[in-house]
From Swiss-Prot:
UniProt-listed Pfam families: PTR2 (PF00854)
GO MF, any single term: dipeptide transmembrane transporter activity
Entry keyword set: Glycoprotein, Membrane, Peptide transport, Protein transport, Transmembrane, Transmembrane helix, Transport
Name of protein: Peptide transporter 3
Family listed: Belongs to the major facilitator superfamily. Proton-dependent oligopeptide transporter (POT/PTR) (TC 2.A.17) family.
Tissue specificity: Expressed in the AVA interneuron.
A GO cellular-component term linked to this record: apical plasma membrane
One GO BP annotation of this record: proton transmembrane transport
Principal place of residence: membrane
InterPro entries: MFS_trans_sf, Oligopep_transport, POT_fam, PTR2_symporter_CS
Length: 701
């Protein structure tokens, strides 16, 4: 028979599945779009500490991977898949609306907080409920004689998953960090609103196929409850002394005669496979930190690559891209080549994958040590940083006012000095009169400048935060003796576009936020606003706008010239140095996560599919629970040490796994073994998403 063309095959598809494809693309965009920027939102808008933001981020993921159990029960026993998707998607939209409203800065914080966290809970609950239903409902639309079409459909289904997540990871950070709204450098209302609109579109697309869908009634059967019943019966009898009265070969055999021997054997096989899922818990604990601790690290990296700039959340896009590239390479070339040299088994692949995941965190730890060298740490408790700028006048007899204690040799040098918070007195050398400076608020940085005027000395000071700028910006403070509200300072790029402006007043500042494509070399102009408006201003100086840096523009009162003083060092470690850890953890995902699920299906009884899926989802839940307990509580205060701890923990877990794997006996091919069709394989992996929209190839091992 002549092979049908792709177009002919597409015409043979049930029309309803095309609505499901659009629905899946939009839903994945909405979920990943929101989740990609969530961690930075918690830090910047709610001003949570990194550990608290990590705790909430992983709590959200925990809920999203625990609620699928509720969704599957409702679909199988109460409503059916169609109604669960319909109701869940409607609630999903409400969650996005709540989160988008909570991002509006005009609202009071209690209102914003209530909207945000109720929205996050609703989204986590809704996405979890529909998670076990969408791909299965799409498969329901095909008849039994359309298995080849169904298998091909899941390739398109994967494209929808990967396309939605990939575009979301790239686009929503741009909406957050490169669009300004409501007077803020970030535009979270837009960044959350666009995924909300996509979820609404997903619901509309789903409704458009209403009349075409095959809606199967709920099966009313829950295998999971039967498994629990078998285990409970066995344990109850063992506690009651049944093992002494009637010896058995396996403790689960105590469940007879209340349960059939087939169910007991299936449960035994399930528990044997369960040990394989143990390393997956720790894998997810490491893997899901790409959205939290690795983003935190990326915020302190230099995102400029030539004239392009990469936002911290966007580097995560390398994961789905690498998966799409690596999986066919491994299936088509790597595994066949290795089979010529050695035996390639699923357990061996999983062991290598786990060790690679551990290695990726070791690399992250080394990178963090390099990042630490560029970090700015706040002053010690009860102390301040005093940054003196300018050379107009020497400062002498610098003393602590309360006890007259001389600081050092009494000469305050140019640059940064760490001091006790308090009030200080000093002489300028121009007149024999004492000056005073109040720097009594602890744990801050202060800028101090002494200007020599005609017959007087002007002392200027202002405070600043001792931390790197957010959003990749370069901040330039102004310090001057000639404060003038009618004179403006402009930051202008090479194209003549005004990037930012402020009044000529000490403590005011301009922020230079890099665009998607931008030149780091900008110029600062200043002059009277009634006679100049940018490049035509008479005074100018060149600035190299490095990400994360904070400068002071010291404007001389007599010459109107300016010079820069560095307050906070720039992000000098390139974000490209994080690529190795992302590529290696993706290799670990391909070898451990994808292989693990396929292996579990090949070793368990056919009636255990739904229970295996539930167990798979629970490994993601448990992994994020570990993140909450360790990273979310700041159990290890230093980020680099924390990365090394996770790496060591994964090595230990994989060591135990390897010892167990050496004793494992594979289930031989027989009639009771699950036959994994490509559509089923993709169906289940699509259900769990492998957190990045992982696709598998069309080859089966």
């Amino acid at each position: 028979m002549e092979e049908k063309s792709l177009l002919q095959k597409l015409r043979s598809y049930p029309p309803a599945v095309f609505f499901m494809l659009g629905n899946e693309f939009c839903e994945r965009f909405s979920f990943y779009g929101m989740k990609t920027i969530l961690f930075i939102y918690l830090i910047t808008e709610h001003e949570f500490s990194p550990s608290k933001a990590t705790f909430i981020y992983h709590l959200f993921t925990c809920i999203a991977y625990l609620t699928p159990l509720i969704g599957s029960i409702m679909a199988d026993s109460v409503f059916g898949r169609f109604k669960v998707i319909l109701y869940g998607s409607s609630i999903y939209v409400v969650g996005h609306v709540l989160l988008s409203l909570g991002a509006v800065p005009f609202l009071s914080y209690p209102i914003r907080s209530s909207l945000d966290f109720s929205g996050l809970f609703v989204i986590a609950f809704a996405t979890g409920c529909i998670k076990p239903c969408v791909s299965a409902f799409a498969a329901d639309q095909f008849t039994e004689d359309q298995k080849d079409l169904r298998s091909q459909f899941f390739s398109f289904f994967y494209f929808a998953i990967n396309g939605g997540s990939l575009f979301a990871i790239i686009i929503t950070p741009i909406l957050r960090g490169r669009v300004q709204c409501f007077g803020n450098a970030h535009c979270f209302p837009l960044a959350f609103g666009v995924p909300g609109v996509l979820m609404l579109l997903a619901l509309i697309l789903f409704l458009m196929g209403w009349s075409m869908y095959k809606k199967h009634p709920p099966s009313k059967e829950n295998v999971g409850s039967k498994v629990v019943a078998v285990i409970y019966t066995s344990l109850r009898k063992m506690v009651g002394g049944a093992s002494r009265d009637k010896p058995v070969t396996h403790w689960l055999d105590h469940a007879a005669p209340e349960h059939s021997q087939k169910m007991i054997d299936s449960t035994r096989g399930l528990l044997n496979v369960a040990v394989i899922f143990c390393p997956l818990i720790f894998f997810w604990a490491l893997f899901d930190q790409q959205g939290s601790t690795w983003v935190l690290q990326a915020r302190r990296l230099d995102g400029r690559v030539g004239h392009f700039s990469i936002l911290p959340e966007q580097i995560h896009a390398i994961n789905p891209v690498c998966v799409l590239i690596l999986v066919p390479i491994f299936e088509g070339w790597v595994y066949p080549a290795l089979r010529k040299i050695t035996r390639v088994t699923p357990l061996r692949k999983m062991a290598v994958g786990g060790l690679l995941t551990a290695f990726s965190f070791a690399i992250a730890g080394v990178l963090q040590l390099k990042v630490n060298e560029t970090m700015e740490f706040p002053p010690s408790l009860g102390r301040i940083y005093l940054q003196r700028v300018g050379n107009e006048s020497l400062i002498s007899d610098f003393r602590y006012k309360s006890d007259g204690r001389l600081i050092g040799d009494g000469m305050l040098p140019k640059g940064r000095t760490e001091l006790d918070a308090g009030i200080y007195t000093f002489n300028t050398g121009l007149k024999n009169e004492s000056q005073e400076i109040d720097i009594s608020t602890p744990n801050k940085g202060y800028v101090m400048a002494v200007f020599r005027l005609k017959d007087a000395v002007e002392v200027v000071k202002f405070d600043y935060k001792v931390e790197k700028t957010d959003n990749g910006a370069t901040r330039v403070f102004v310090v001057t003796a000639r404060e003038d509200a009618d004179t403006l300072v402009y930051a202008i790029n090479k194209k003549g576009k005004i990037l930012s402006s402020c009044e000529l007043k000490s403590g005011s500042y301009v922020d230079v936020i890099p665009g998607i494509i931008s030149d780091p070399n900008v110029r600062l102009y200043w002059g009277p606003k009634n006679s100049c408006s940018g490049v035509d201003c008479p005074n100018t100086v060149t600035l190299n706008a490095q990400m994360g840096a904070v400068h002071v523009l010291h404007i001389h009162p007599s010459t109107t010239e300016g010079d820069f003083n560095l307050l906070v060092r720039p992000n000098s470690v390139s974000i490209l140095w994080s690529l190795p850890q992302y590529i290696i953890i993706t290799l670990g995902e391909v070898l451990l996560s994808v292989t693990g699920l396929e292996f579990a299906y090949s070793q368990a009884a056919p009636n255990m599919k739904s229970v295996l899926t539930a167990m798979w989802l629970l490994t993601v839940f448990a992994g994020n629970l570990i993140d909450m307990m360790i990273s979310g509580t700041r159990l290890i205060p230093h980020p680099a040490l924390e990365f090394f701890f996770y790496s060591t923990l994964m090595v230990i877990v994989m060591g135990v796994f390897i010892l167990l794997a050496m004793q494992y006996t594979y289930v031989e091919d027989n009639d009771d073994e699950i036959t994994i069709t490509e559509s089923e394989k993709k169906d289940v992996i699509a259900l769990t998403e492998i957190e990045s929209g992982t696709a598998t190839s069309d080859k089966k091992e």
